[in-house]
C-alpha cells in the first residue's frame, strides 16, 4: 500500500502526482489489474510462452 503525506504548503495536485508516481514504481496498479479475474494455470502458462515467443522475435 502506497502512502503519501501532504506536505506543508503543498498543493493537492503535487501530492497526487507523487502518489501516482509511487504507485507506478511499486507496480501496485498493474498487479491489481492482473489479479482482477481468476486465470487458470494453463492460461497463465500459455500467456507466458506466447510472451517469450514475442520477445524472441
UniProtKB/Swiss-Prot annotation:
UniProt keyword annotations, A-Z: Ribonucleoprotein, Ribosomal protein
PROSITE patterns linked to this entry: RIBOSOMAL_S21
InterPro entries in the cross-refs: Ribosomal_bS21, Ribosomal_bS21_CS, Ribosomal_bS21_sf
Kindly state a single biological-process term from the GO annotations of this entry. Answer: translation
Q: Which GO terms describe its cellular component?
A: ribonucleoprotein complex; ribosome
- A single GO molecular function, which one? structural constituent of ribosome
Bilayer-crossing regions: none
Q: Does the keyword Ribonucleoprotein apply?
A: yes
Q: Which PANTHER family match?
A: MITOCHONDRIAL 28S RIBOSOMAL PROTEIN S21, SMALL RIBOSOMAL SUBUNIT PROTEIN BS21
Say which family it is in.
Belongs to the bacterial ribosomal protein bS21 family.
Q: What is this protein called?
A: Small ribosomal subunit protein bS21
Species annotation: Bacillus subtilis (strain 168)
State the organism's lineage: Bacteria, Bacillati, Bacillota, Bacilli, Bacillales
Amino acid at each position: 500500500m502506497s502512502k503519501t503525506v501532504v506536505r506543508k504548503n503543498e498543493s493537492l495536485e503535487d501530492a497526487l502526482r507523487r502518489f501516482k508516481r509511487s504507485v507506478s514504481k511499486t507496480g501496485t496498479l498493474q498487479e491489481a489489474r492482473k489479479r482482477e479475474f481468476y486465470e487458470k494455470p494453463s492460461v497463465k502458462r500459455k500467456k507466458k510462452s506466447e510472451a517469450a515467443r514475442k520477445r524472441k522475435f
